[in-house]
Amino acid sequence: MTIEHLVGSAHFPDVVRLTLTLDAEYELDARLGAGSFGAVYRARALTLPASAPVYHAVKAIRKDPSRPDSVETVRREAMLHTRVTDIPGVVNVHGVWEDDEHVYIMLNYCAGGELYDWIEEDEFQGDDKHVRDIFVQILDAVRACHKKAVYHRDLKPENILCNEDGTKVYIADFGLVTDRKRSIRFGVGSAAYMSPGMSRSPDQCIGGEYNHTAYLTRSSDIWALGIILVNLIAGRNPWRTARLEDRQFWRFLGSIDEETNFWEHLGVSEELAVMLDRVFEMEPEMRLSIEEMREEVLSIRAFFAPQPVDTDPEKAVWRVACPLDASLGLHESEFLHGH
């Protein structure tokens, strides 16, 4: 079996025994994620003894001959990810290679898996210190990326990886990255984490982004950071999508007008609720900056409300759910035009 056969197939095995030669020989021994255009594998360096294995992650992306610009999309991902690879909270890029069929990106292997899984296991529930420590790491990494004009556009728990004990986190999956401060590419990313102006074309947007012909990529990342913070506290998303037809998002907008606390039913403290209202500001330039978010997060005494979470079905919310294979498919099949 060759890497071409493996990555180009419709189904990817969970565990493989396949040698791939890049800068050295590696054995691909586990599939970490897969989509229609690529797969991510755990790779063990064969130059080192099996008794003391050293692992990396290899992202293998199939070139689409029917869409020549898909190759440039992948190259842009690799180039911009490499630009920020020295940032402590970003998954390191160790090398990029190409053959006739694929582009390969070698990355740090993070043994703790996705932040999503830690949230699903309620690892943060009631632990203010853990929430603060992890979220400040995320803020610092994204802020450092922005300083280098790298805007992620797909921040979510599935794209944040953890070390083995869950004390360190790293931004990953730069498939939708851009270096442009404004973007006219709408509808990229994951719906629950998109800002209102990012999810739709300008004539369909709401709030301060209504008449804009482009959205601010920095502000859209800030919106996604706010959703991630809610995930850490509640283990849920506050709404499915930031659109008027979404019942929960409509309730949130109404709570601002009525000066009521939308966040109470998610078990969020009053201190944090005040901050979240400022993060989810409809006018993108009025949202808290990452620096302001960091200052607020460090000053908040408690993230969790003292009372139990409301279980009223009328206030139902949704579990975090956006699998990796869907993300890979979007990156390589849909995000091919515009930045």
Give residue ranges: language-model regions.
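Glycine-rich ATP phosphate-binding loop
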Residues: 39-63
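Conserved short submotifs of the Hanks-type protein kinase catalytic core
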Residues: 100-114, 118
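Regulatory extensions appended to serine/threonine kinase catalytic cores
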Residues: 305-339
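Activation segment signature within eukaryotic-like protein kinase domains
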Residues: 134-135
